[in-house]
Amino acid sequence: MATLKHINSKNADYGAAEQYLLFEHDEFTMKPVLDETGRLIPREDYRLSTLNCGGEDFAVACMRANLRYEKNQRREDVKSHHYIISFDPRDGPDNGLTVDRAQELGEKFCAEHFPGHQALICTHPDGHNHSGNIHVHIVINSLRIEEVPFLPYMDRPADTKAGCKHRCTDAACLLYTSPSPRDPKTSRMPSSA
């Protein structure tokens, strides 16, 4: 079964998230790893897609939306939310999970749970400890750009409106990881099976 981790960020540089996902980083210091000439080292294997960016770069699309709605302008504002879905290392050999399938699952999870948000979805085949766990990073702009239907974890009407901010509530995290009403043995987390 997959696990979910949430990190919110006040960093106004949306490009930093993409840089982290595309280039090697020291997993302990979080600093980029450089080659002998001082250049960033691209990650060897990843899948990357965006959602609701209108064909623009994720960072540019987020900055345009923030300006349009006059949000995320203050230093203390949470600018983005980073969700990491980590699959069990056994999901590869036992259930046939591949990086491509994990990317599909991440895109579906993002579309279902973060509708109306600009998103960057990136899948890596392994972590820094070489445990073999495929993991999906989902980075969303905290600002919703489209009105969406009221979802079970939302507790205010404003949570559905374009121009309003995403809130990672306890109810949302419980919903994401709770058993599915369709099948109590499974969670709403993406399943590799």
Regions found by a protein language model. Give the residues of each.
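Single conserved hydrophobic/aromatic residue that forms the stacking wall/gate
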Residues: Y176-A193
